[in-house]
Design a protein with these regions (language model features):
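Short active-site-adjacent structural elements
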Residues: 118, 158-159
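Residues that form generic nucleotide/phosphate-binding pockets
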Residues: 114, 137
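Short, charged, surface-exposed hinge/linker loops at domain edges
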Residues: 115-121
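Short beta-strand->loop
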Residues: 122-127
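Crotonase-fold acyl-CoA enzyme core
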Residues: 1-108, 131, 139-140, 144-148, ...
Length: 161
């Protein structure tokens, strides 16, 4: 999932953006979880995802004070992959999504699974798990189609099989 943020991204909207794989934003974007200032805290995974995305101290400052992060800081700390002018935001997010969709679906799913799994496991465990998934993906029709299409100088036609 690709999130394109143009303007304020607060509360549940920010929690939704945090659940996305890739985030881009416009220069005027503001990110925050202000729930603490209202007497409660984010309940849709915002706490858990923010501390996994930003440095602990910065994440906790935002969570405990309700403070916001601007676009420049969001890019510097890796919350967003890039900052683009508002008029380019949607076309670029669709371009990213299309590039992902063009790839083999099972391989895309495996990369997402390994990247999530690796957060909670050692490098050695992650490498073993990645190798087992790579072997499984290597047995698919899509894994045969990619090299075949390359050698035939044509675009691959991935079917998710």
């Amino acid at each position: 999932l690709v999130a394109a943020v143009d303007g304020f991204c607060l509360g549940a909207g920010f929690e939704l953006a945090l659940a996305c794989d890739i985030r881009i934003c416009s220069p005027g974007a503001q990110f925050g979880l202000p729930e603490i200032t209202l007497g409660f805290f984010p309940g849709a995974g915002g706490v858990q995802r923010l501390v996994r995305t930003l440095p602990q101290s910065l994440a906790l400052e935002m969570l405990l004070t309700g403070s916001r992060l601007d676009a420049e800081k969001a890019e510097r700390f890796g919350l967003v992959s890039r900052v683009l002018p508002s008029d380019m935001l949607m076309s670029e997010s669709l371009s990213i999504a299309n590039k992902i969709a063009f790839n083999a679906p099972l391989a895309v799913r495996a990369v997402k699974e390994i990247s999530r799994w690796s957060r909670d496991h050692s490098l050695e465990e992650s490498l073993r798990y990645g190798n087992s998934l790579r072997w499984a993906i290597g047995q698919t029709e899509d894994a045969k189609e990619g090299p075949r299409a390359f050698s035939e100088r044509r675009a691959p036609i991935f079917k998710g099989t």
